[in-house]
Amino acid sequence: MNLMLTAKCNNVDEFKKNGYDVVKKEFDSWCDNSKSIFAKIDDNNLVELFFDVNPVELKKWLEKESTQNIFKTHGFFPTRYTFEGLSM
């Protein structure tokens, strides 16, 4: 399963540096981290792509207090996401 999401946050650069990059190594527990993509749309919007996602492990990671604290600290809020397979 693959995951694409768009999200809002207080400041994308700060979230990338002090949130995403800090916990990126933890992504190994729920996806193929070598393929993960983070892209800034503007100062408050971003897109993330994750591949070969294990939904059970992702749910566990999202429920962790440390993960929730990062989301709260940076005002991270997904605005759209999909687990649909990509097709041409």
Question: Over which residues does each language-model region extend?
Answer:
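Glycine-rich beta-strand-turn "strand-cap" elements at beta-sheet edges
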Residues: 8-9, 29-47, 69-88
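Short glycine-/aliphatic-rich beta-strand segments at the starts of folded cytosolic domains
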Residues: 1-11
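Short amphipathic alpha-helix segments
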Residues: 14-30
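Alpha-helix boundary/capping residues
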Residues: 19-22, 65-66, 74-77
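Short amphipathic alpha-helices within nucleic acid-binding modules
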Residues: 14-18, 55-64
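Short beta-strand segments enriched in hydrophobic/aromatic residues
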Residues: 9, 52-53
